[in-house]
Amino acid sequence: MASFEIMIASQPPCQQCRSSKRYLTKNGTPYLETKYKDDSSAQALAAANNYTAAPVCYVVDKRTGDVLSHWAGFNMYRLRQWVNNYKEEVGE
């Protein structure tokens, strides 16, 4: 089990949200999906960083609750980075 959790705060309809989820699923990396309108953490990150695109994605350390990384929209580089981190931690 990984020491972090990938969160995707999405909005319907959202192609970048679907693409982000599809990429993680295709690569065997678990994530938690929330609705942006109900996710106060995602809203705070979006406001603090002037994010205007969906989804708002963030990675949380399961032990401390700290946000390790965050971005908005479909970001292949960031997604690949966290897929690789996940595979490294779980020994794939």
Descriptions of predicted regions:
Residues 34-53, 63, 82-90:
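Thioredoxin-like thiol-disulfide oxidoreductase module
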Residues 55-58:
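Cytosolic beta-strand hydrophobic patch enriched in CBS
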Residues 18, 22, 43, 80-81:
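Alpha-helical elements of the RecA-like P-loop NTPase motor core of helicases
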Residues 15, 40-41, 77-78:
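Short alpha-helical
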